[in-house]
Regions:
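Extended alpha-helical scaffold and adjacent linker segments that couple domains
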Residues: 5, 9, 130-133, 194-198
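Charge-enriched interaction surfaces
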Residues: 17-20, 36-39, 61-65, 79-98, ...
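Surface-exposed cleft-lining segments at the edges of enzyme active sites
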Residues: 50-51, 125-132, 156-164
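Conserved catalytic cores of phosphodiester-cleaving nucleases, focusing on short active-site segments
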Residues: 69, 141-160
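Mg2+/Mn2+-dependent nuclease catalytic core
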Residues: 159-183
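Nuclease-adjacent, charged terminal/linker segments that flank catalytic cores
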Residues: 1-87, 265-270
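Domain-level recognition of nuclease-like catalytic cores that cleave nucleotide substrates
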Residues: 163, 189-270
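Active-site metal-binding core of divalent-cation-utilizing nuclease and nuclease-like domains
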Residues: 81-148
Length: 270
């Protein structure tokens, strides 16, 4: 069982490893040019470097999720065992899946209910598939865990999504569930979108500014924000703050100071 100290240690070491990989790649990055190099040369180079770090950090959230889940007793599966090997879906099942998507969008069913209806359709029609394929680009998962007979699968996204993305993300959830139920019709599935942190001062502000983008998805069930996600994986309250405390400690480390100097040097390079 995890506690505050173990969550902190896992977050610290997982993030440190990610920073080491990013630092190693910094010196090998291919320098590019655009018009802002003329207008704001140093700032543009710093932005480019930091943007690469933000992109790299996406893999850190995934690794941290796996590390915490594993330490808290979840069985973990490689995401590519799913993304590169799903059953081919028949046209009638695709049509039924889309029917459930439309019913969800008109709020006639919840996502959980839609998944249960897809399960019933597969079982009643005795559907199976021997053909395999890769998940379509952009529709794969970032994590796949199991605990107490329930599979948790999902994607980790930016907490600031575009307007209307809720419908697209909800469709992804139905796609993932359909693939798993074709392979294991009796599997209990919790398919979610995870946002690793709240960029605003509090939850209420987040929901007022971002929540409408995900309608009719429901927070806490269909998408998980910050502690809703990390506490689910770790079993420890206030996990997001603990994770960011680890980041704060890393910000004062020799490694970060070295990276800051590397960024400064690269931004001056011509």
């Amino acid at each position: 069982m995890l506690n505050e100290d173990s969550v902190y240690e896992i977050a610290f070491h997982s993030t440190k490893q990610n920073l080491v990989r990013w630092e190693d790649n910094l010196s090998n990055r291919e320098q590019t040019f655009n018009h802002f190099d003329v207008l704001f040369p140093n700032a543009r180079q710093i932005h480019s470097i930091v943007q690469s770090g933000l992109t790299s950090f996406g893999s850190n959230w995934e690794k941290l999720a796996y590390d915490l889940a594993s330490a808290n007793g979840y069985k973990t599966f490689e995401k590519n065992d799913f993304n590169k090997n799903v059953p081919v879906i028949s046209e009638d099942l695709k049509e039924f899946q889309q029917k459930m998507r439309r019913k969800f969008e008109t709020e006639d069913v919840t996502l959980d209910k839609a998944i249960d209806e897809i399960r019933k359709f597969i079982i009643q029609n005795k559907l199976s598939s021997t053909e395999r394929k890769k998940v379509e680009s952009g529709k794969g998962i970032d994590f796949w865990f199991e605990k107490d007979g329930v599979e948790l699968i999902g994607d980790i996204k930016s907490p600031q999504e575009n307007i209307g993305n809720g419908k697209k993300l909800a469709e992804h959830i139905l796609i993932w569930a359909t693939y798993r139920l074709m392979d294991e019709p009796m599997t209990e599935i919790e398919a979610v979108i995870a946002f690793p942190y709240n960029p605003y001062a509090d939850f209420e502000t987040y929901m007022s500014l971002q929540g409408q983008k995900f309608a009719p998805m429901k927070t806490g069930t269909d998408y998980l924000i910050a502690d809703q996600f990390w506490e689910k994986l770790s079993g420890v309250a206030n996990s997001t703050k603990i994770i960011f405390d680890a980041f704060e400690a890393l910000s004062q480390s020799e490694q970060i100071l070295r990276i800051k100097q590397t960024i400064a040097d690269l931004s001056q390079a011509k």
